UniProtKB/Swiss-Prot annotation:
Modified residues (N4-methylasparagine): 72
Protein name per UniProt: C-phycocyanin beta subunit
Function description: Light-harvesting photosynthetic bile pigment-protein from the phycobiliprotein complex (phycobilisome, PBS). Phycocyanin is the major phycobiliprotein in the PBS rod.
GO biological process: photosynthesis
Species the sequence originates in: Synechocystis sp. (strain PCC 6701)
Lineage: Bacteria, Bacillati, Cyanobacteriota, Cyanophyceae, Oscillatoriophycideae
UniProt binding sites for (2R,3E)-phycocyanobilin 1: 82
Gene symbol of the encoding locus: cpcB
Length: 172
């Protein structure tokens, strides 16, 4: 996992080049937006249980066959595994938000996840819907302007959305 700084410096160092003005400007913007990023991660982390629970409730309301006898989330053990997986995906999304880089999400969470679900007979499309529902919950919480650093957060929220979209696409 590389943060944005390490990634840029490593690339330039490998080429034997100085940082460009555009790269310095982009990294400076990242620093100036760091409080917004921290606020976003804190909000999502502080509400992780509610995000997962609400997303799961919504998913199971839309797809009741998942919790019916024979469904992939039927029995408390399978339900717990489903909620655990959703929580793990959410946790890695917060790591990506904090780092400003999706590599930790890709490398440590999503790599091979679709194959695992296929092997277990878990419908990837349902997992993807659950991830999208977590995205909706997380963005609603992160976009609440009460008690956070002021300023335009639209770019950060778009970035946050892409991490959830990557996760959903990886399992679909």
């Amino acid at each position: 996992m590389y943060d944005a700084f390490t990634r840029v410096v490593s690339q330039r160092d490998a080429r034997g080049e100085f940082l460009s003005s555009a790269q310095i400007d982009a990294l400076s913007k990242l620093v100036s937006d760091s409080n917004k990023r921290i606020d976003t991660v804190n909000r999502i982390t502080g509400n992780a249980s509610a995000i997962v629970t609400n997303a799961a409730r919504s998913l199971f309301a839309e797809q009741p066959q998942l919790i019916a006898p024979g469904g992939n989330a039927y029995t408390s053990r399978r339900m717990a595994a489903c909620l655990r997986d959703m929580e793990i995906i959410l946790r890695y999304v917060t790591y990506a938000i904090f780092a400003g880089d999706a590599s930790v999400l890709e490398d440590r969470c999503l790599n091979g996840l679709r194959e695992t679900y296929l092997a277990l007979g878990t419908p990837g499309s349902s997992v993807a819907v659950g991830v999208q529902k977590m995205k909706d919950e997380a963005l609603a919480i992160a976009n609440d302007t009460n008690g956070i650093t002021l300023g335009d957060c639209s770019a950060l929220m778009a970035e946050v959305a892409t991490y959830f979209d990557r996760a959903a696409a990886a399992v679909a």
